[in-house]
Each structure stands twice: as C-alpha cells, then as structure tokens.
C-alpha cells in the first residue's frame, strides 16, 4: 500500500471518529434516561434466596453494603449516587419499574434523578 493511500485511510478514519464523537446523544458521558427494574448490584436480575420477596432482598442487600442497580433488559447497571432523596426513592421502588436519569460510564450510571414508571 502506498504512503498516499495509507495517509488517505488515516485521514478518513480520523474524520469519521471525530464526527461520531460529536453526534448529540451518542457521545460518552451524555445524560440520558434509562427505564428498568430497581435491584441491587449483588443479586442483579436474580433474587433466588428462598422465603424472601425480591423487594425485601434488594433492601437487605443494600443495607449490607451493596449498591442499587437498574436491570434494563439483560443488562445490569450499578447506580452511583449519594443524594439521599434519590436513595429514598430507590428504596421505595425496590424491584419496581423506574426511570433513572444520569450519565452512564460502562456498567455504572451516575444518577441525577429517579422517578416511578406510571402503570
């Protein structure tokens, strides 16, 4: 491959990469709303302890130090927040559907707000 062709491929790749990084809503670190079931990071989508309701399991795991999580389809996001109002809402919505607005980085959502999903 000639040097000119290598340069052309490199420039095209750089332009495409830069363009994709600035597409609104696609950039890493952008705020979005996730809808899913409130759980905990220890159990995720599976609460298998016999004799305990899933909502009670979520609360027990969080009380033992686990973080809240949001199950969205097959994906489990760990929820990160120190806001007491958000934590209280997550506790109230244990094992229920919720809308969580925040910034996702990998498998963690930095929570900005939590609301119930109207039934």
Model-derived segments and spans:
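Bacterial N-terminal signal peptides
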Residues: 9-22
